[in-house]
Amino acid sequence: MGRVGVVSWGAYIPKYRIRTEEVARIWGDDPLRIVDLYLVDEKSVEGIDEDAVTIAVEAARRALRRATLDPRRIGAVYVGTESKPYAVKPISSILIDALGLSNNVFAVDMEFACKAGSEGLMAAVGLVESGKVEYGMTVGADTSQGEPGEHLEYSASSGGVALVVGREGVAAELEAAYAYASDTPDFWRREGSPYPMHGEGFTGEPAYFRHVINAARGLMAAYGYKPSDFAYAVFHQPNGRFPVRAASTLNIPMEKVKPGIVVTHIGNTYNASALMGFAKVLDQAKPGDKILVVTFGSGAGSNAYVFSATDLIKERQNAAVPTVEAMLRDKIYVDYAQYLKMRKMIKLFEY
């Protein structure tokens, strides 16, 4: 696929955290059982003045700062989220003014559950490869929803990642891409509903594992890769168990997966989930390292990518931008009452 690839990346994780044991305490669940079930110790919580827009803006600013890139050279902006503050009003157009981009930019919000942000990656790559734009940006950002007392509440969290793609200054070249999708009713949220629903019988084998495994195997078969070719492997992380099992099924050893695991510390950031693991790996990769990234979105589909780190990776890593590891350590714990307030889940009624 030529020299098109990731020029820069930026991530943002809200510093607030709520421990799994605190949520379990409120609902009378056994905290040890819940932690063992999901392998999520705590999750990130957006501040009371944060939403998917502010998270996307901060991640995108960090991506631009890392490459010292003139924002007016960005010709396309894609945003993937399940947490739009507005039913009808794009986040991508807000980014144009917030980041100082040109008004002559292709901008759109995308939707495919948790893989919309990574779908924007391919759209941006396509425009760059065609010569229509010099650089493109895709952002995955969410303040994901989980109904109080329902098991999604233990993992649904907040965060964002932005990727800039182009031909010049590439830090991680995109070598291969492959997709696998089908109509699978594993997870949905109807219009006007504040919380999603999920068909528990569909979330494992028919949805996540079928699509993730087929996308990864399809990519390796189509391009001739072997598990031993990859220095790192990153998967969508709805919980701590699924990506580990996916890697085992693909005969990828844990030492290649563990560096990209973030769900244990921040939960499932939905559109930023696999991308956050990818950003964490980019923070530490060496020139020549090949990185397998497999995203997943309910409904359902997976995209698999292979990136190869270039000699510019070290220069990008040395930029004055917070690493994912640093953000994982920078945290303030809140209790359940503060969590409800910050997530605006306490409703006031006028009489």
Curated annotation (Swiss-Prot):
Top-level EC class: transferase
Molecular function GO labels: acetyl-CoA C-acetyltransferase activity; hydroxymethylglutaryl-CoA synthase activity
Active site residues of this protein: E82 (proton donor/acceptor), C114 (acyl-thioester intermediate), H236 (proton donor/acceptor)
Keyword Transferase: yes
InterPro entries listed in its UniProt record: ACP_syn_III_C (IPR013747), HMG_CoA_Synthase (IPR004656), Thiolase-like (IPR016039), Thiolase_N (IPR020616)
Pathway where this protein functions: Metabolic intermediate biosynthesis; (R)-mevalonate biosynthesis; (R)-mevalonate from acetyl-CoA: step 2/3
Catalyzed reactions: acetoacetyl-CoA + acetyl-CoA + H2O = (3S)-3-hydroxy-3-methylglutaryl-CoA + CoA + H(+)
BP-aspect Gene Ontology terms: farnesyl diphosphate biosynthetic process, mevalonate pathway; isopentenyl diphosphate biosynthetic process, mevalonate pathway
Chain sites annotated for binding CoA: R241
Annotated positions binding (3S)-3-hydroxy-3-methylglutaryl-CoA: D30, C114, S155, T203, H236, R245, N268, S298
Enzyme Commission (EC) number: 2.3.3.10
Keyword terms, alphabetized: Acyltransferase, Isoprene biosynthesis, Transferase
HAMAP family, alphabetized: HMG_CoA_synth_arch (MF_01409)
Self-association and partners: Interacts with acetoacetyl-CoA thiolase that catalyzes the precedent step in the pathway and with a DUF35 protein. The acetoacetyl-CoA thiolase/HMG-CoA synthase complex channels the intermediate via a fused CoA-binding site, which allows for efficient coupling of the endergonic thiolase reaction with the exergonic HMGCS reaction.
Function: Catalyzes the condensation of acetyl-CoA with acetoacetyl-CoA to form 3-hydroxy-3-methylglutaryl-CoA (HMG-CoA). Functions in the mevalonate (MVA) pathway leading to isopentenyl diphosphate (IPP), a key precursor for the biosynthesis of isoprenoid compounds that are building blocks of archaeal membrane lipids.
Family to which this protein belongs: Belongs to the thiolase-like superfamily. Archaeal HMG-CoA synthase family.
UniProt-recorded name of the protein: Hydroxymethylglutaryl-CoA synthase
